[in-house]
């Protein structure tokens, strides 16, 4: 893609309304634009990142055996009355009526809808377990939306829901998602620490938040530093191995980890002083086991092995891709701009032509772009008639993993320059060696 033809509305000045790093950088890098309080348009660069985050989330959900569906955003109020949550949810829920005066709502979550889908189509324990998930837009009318997409009113959410015959089977479904989330965050270049959490309005008696450490985090967290080096299960992890998966979850919950809401200073004091870590953190995922909280009032039942009907045991599991984009920036940036992990970078390579109009530079850039794209790498080619300094600033701001710098002086010696955005390391090399070099690194 040529930058001269791309839509990248970069801002030179830092917007006054942006309070945290990710909000400032997403606005400045032309990733998003605010349309109303807590509501954002995702522009081309931001959408590429958002789609890549969703691809990783989707791949790990599928690997764990979850099945993707898509449920309506506008939901019937009567379903929420069945579960008892319609009045309890509060003003965060946007309520509306259609032309026939039927009460509807803009779904902040989907436990009721997915339970209705399940009860209408599943009758026997032989059809279990099931884990259904979607990636869709949600709306919560926050009193004070802030921090850009970190705490917006409209947001993209992966919400999943499991259905099992009993508590033991439901716990295994919970563990599957627990492990799949560990893998998801690792693939996104994040170290997420699971912490026991309050179940809040969703309910239930078992819940974990997944927290990444960041200086601008909204919560204070306390944990054992052992979590920073714990190995994440590999792609070959067997999600059907009940004991093996329980062992992974036990290992990842054996050390102290708590947000300020659940923190117990006396228990934390038992952690060796050298291993205690107090920091700021950002919630990037939340999982719940809530038993029959929804299935009992909504009569989501199956026939068990003994022929009697019983309510299914349920769990719900959330990751916010739009929030994850901001969280990744909070965890990975410097004074010059964003530093994208390879897995979710909008493009792999920023190709910088230092002298547009120079025949040798133009030809070399065209050949390099073709070679990189043939090798499976995505390229954003800065072919604008701008000063080199402006091009370098743009490349650093948008944070693509690699910068390939092509200028007349280097080409005279048959060389180009390669820069790694994360480390700042530079090297000169022959253009023909470039694709293999990037692939190897």
Swiss-Prot record:
Membership in a protein family: Belongs to the class-II aminoacyl-tRNA synthetase family. ProS type 2 subfamily.
Pfam families in the record: HGTP_anticodon (PF03129), tRNA-synt_2b (PF00587)
Protein name, UniProt field: Proline--tRNA ligase
EC number(s) reported in the record: 6.1.1.15
Chemical reaction(s) catalysed: tRNA(Pro) + L-proline + ATP = L-prolyl-tRNA(Pro) + AMP + diphosphate
Protein's job: Catalyzes the attachment of proline to tRNA(Pro) in a two-step reaction: proline is first activated by ATP to form Pro-AMP and then transferred to the acceptor end of tRNA(Pro).
EC class (word): ligase
Gene Ontology BP terms: prolyl-tRNA aminoacylation
GO MF entries: ATP binding; proline-tRNA ligase activity
UniProt keyword terms in alphabetical order: Aminoacyl-tRNA synthetase, ATP-binding, Cytoplasm, Ligase, Nucleotide-binding, Protein biosynthesis
Main subcellular location of this protein, as a coarse class: cytoplasm
Annotated localization: Cytoplasm
A GO cellular component entry from the record: cytosol
InterPro entries found in the cross-reference section: aa-tRNA-synt_IIb (IPR002314), aa-tRNA-synth_II (IPR006195), aa-tRNA-synth_II/BPL/LPL (IPR045864), Anticodon-bd (IPR004154), Anticodon-bd_dom_sf (IPR036621), Pro-tRNA-ligase_IIa (IPR002316), Pro-tRNA-synth_IIa_bac-type (IPR004500), Pro-tRNA_synthetase (IPR050062)
Self-association and partners: Homodimer.
Record's keyword annotation contains ATP-binding: yes
Organism: Methylorubrum extorquens (strain PA1)
């Amino acid at each position: 893609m040529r930058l001269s033809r791309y839509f990248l509305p970069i801002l030179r000045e830092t917007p006054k309304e942006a309070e945290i790093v990710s909000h400032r950088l997403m606005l400045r890098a032309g990733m998003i634009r605010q349309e109303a309080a807590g509501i954002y348009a995702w522009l081309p660069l931001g959408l590429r990142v958002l789609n890549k985050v969703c691809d990783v989330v989707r791949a790990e959900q599928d690997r764990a055996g979850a099945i993707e569906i898509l449920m309506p955003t506008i939901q019937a109020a009567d379903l929420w009355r069945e579960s008892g949550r319609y009045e309890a949810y509060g003003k965060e829920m946007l309520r509306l009526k259609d032309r026939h005066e039927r009460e509807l709502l803009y779904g902040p979550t989907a436990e009721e809808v997915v339970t209705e889908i399940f009860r209408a189509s599943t009758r026997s324990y032989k059809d279990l377990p099931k884990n259904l998930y979607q990636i869709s837009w949600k709306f919560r009318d926050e009193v004070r939306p802030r921090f850009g997409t970190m705490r917006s009113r409209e947001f993209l959410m992966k919400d999943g829901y499991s259905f099992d015959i009993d508590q033991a089977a439901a716990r295994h479904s919970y563990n599957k998602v627990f492990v799949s989330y560990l893998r998801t965050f690792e693939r996104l270049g994040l170290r997420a620490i699971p912490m026991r959490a309050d179940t809040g309005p969703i309910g239930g008696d078992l819940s974990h938040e997944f927290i990444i450490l960041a200086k601008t985090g909204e919560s204070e967290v306390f944990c054992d530093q052992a979590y920073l080096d714990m190995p994440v299960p590999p792609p070959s992890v067997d999600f059907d191995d009940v004991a093996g998966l329980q062992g992974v979850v036990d290992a990842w919950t054996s050390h102290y980890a708590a947000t300020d809401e659940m923190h117990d200073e006396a228990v934390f004091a038992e952690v060796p002083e050298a291993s205690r870590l107090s920091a700021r953190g950002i919630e990037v995922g939340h999982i719940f086991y809530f038993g029959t909280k929804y299935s009992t009032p909504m009569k989501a039942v199956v026939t068990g092995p003994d022929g009697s009907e019983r309510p299914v045991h349920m769990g719900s599991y959330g990751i916010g891709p739009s929030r994850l984009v901001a969280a990744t920036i909070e965890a990975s940036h410097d004074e010059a701009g964003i530093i994208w992990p390879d897995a979710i970078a909008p493009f792999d390579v920023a190709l910088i032509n230092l002298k547009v109009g120079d025949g040798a530079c133009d030809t070399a850039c065209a050949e390099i772009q073709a070679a990189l794209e043939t090798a499976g790498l995505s390229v954003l080619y800065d072919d604008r008639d701008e000063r080199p300094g402006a091009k370098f600033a743009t490349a650093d701001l948008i944070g693509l993993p690699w910068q390939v710098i092509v200028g007349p002086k280097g080409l005279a010696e048959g060389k180009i320059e390669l820069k790694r955005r994360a480390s700042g390391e530079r090297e000169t090399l022959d253009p023909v060696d470039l694709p293999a070099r990037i692939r190897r690194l």
